[in-house]
Amino acid sequence: MSFISETIIIGTGGAVRLTGSGLGCSDWPLCTPDSLVPILEVQGIHGIIEFGNRLMTGVVGIIALAVVLLVLHLFSGKRGLVNALWFALGGIVAAVATFAIATPLHFPASPIALAVLLVAVIAAAVRSVRTTPARRDLVLLAWLTLIGVVAQALVGGITVLTGLNPFIVGFHYTSSLLLVCITAAFLVRLKTSPGPRERAVPVWFAAVTHVTGLALAVTIVFGVLTTGSGPHSGDADVLRHGFDATVLAHVHSWPGYILAALVLFLTVSAWVLRLEPRRWLLVLVLAILVQVGVGIWQAREGLPPLLVGTHMVLASLSAAAYTVVVLRLKRPVPVDA
């Protein structure tokens, strides 16, 4: 559920940007200075779309919190669960106190209070990972997801308060991709036996796989910059990066083609050598090829919102598939009979 919700919120966040609804709610955490929810007669459909995305953040956060509590219950026992709840209560109290102090001083109370809550969540995560006797990998990944969701809420608020600064918007999207990868890693490790792991592929194959990851990262970064320079900035009055979108589109495509070639090479090699990650490489190569096709199509059609949104979601699925491939480079060490 956490993986699905993280992927969905990339789609809803993309819808906010592609419909020009980024400032549909002009304030944060309220929609307007006087109202928590949008007023249809004032904000129109843009306010509804932006507020819907904010509600989705709450859903993602609840699911992430539920995963943390479930993992702690399974692997830390009652004591670990109670400790986490005490940290949560302390974080909420500290955040409320911070808000109460910052408001009369005319400081940005909401972002500061949320930052205090984020620190409390990080502290709880560190303690949980250190004290959990088993499956610390799952505990860590669950906490990282929750930390990421809280951090994303803070970044989302800053995005609105800065008038959709294109660099912050790009960071917001990239961070969402990382959360999708973390939740994908959680699912893989959940189905993997604990204990020591050993390399399951040749050294050269692992090296090429990591180079492929670099190509994927570069492709995503230039894709974010390209979108920030194009027509979909999130609001008609918001300034873009100032870069030439046409030039960036070509630059974005170069590492994309390199990425496709590397993934195709890895896929063929994995199937010929019958290596562990071969099935997920097949998923990855199909995702990348579809991604390349959608990218070319949207460029030729003048960047229609639906295709751009599809391109954004496919990028998250490609990153998730690559994460699974990397984790399949190793396997649990066989236990001697």
Language-model features and meaning:
Residues M1-G20, A215-L225:
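N-terminal signal-anchor transmembrane alpha helix
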Residues R17-F51, G228, A236-H241:
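Extracytosolic (periplasmic/ER-lumenal) interhelical loops and adjacent juxtamembrane/interface segments
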Residues E41-I63, L248, H252:
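Individual transmembrane alpha-helix segments
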Residues V59-V67, A113-A125, S176-K191, P255-F265, ...:
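Hydrophobic cores of alpha-helical transmembrane segments in multi-pass inner/ER membrane proteins
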Residues L70, L74-A134:
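Transmembrane alpha-helices
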Residues G77-L89, P133-L146, F205-T212, L275-V285, ...:
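Membrane-interfacial loop-to-transmembrane alpha-helix junctions, especially the N-terminal start
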Residues A100-P108, I158-F171, A299-L306:
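Membrane-interface helix caps and helix-loop-helix hairpins in membrane proteins
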Residues A217-A260, L264-W271:
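Membrane-interfacial catalytic/cofactor-binding modules of polytopic membrane enzymes
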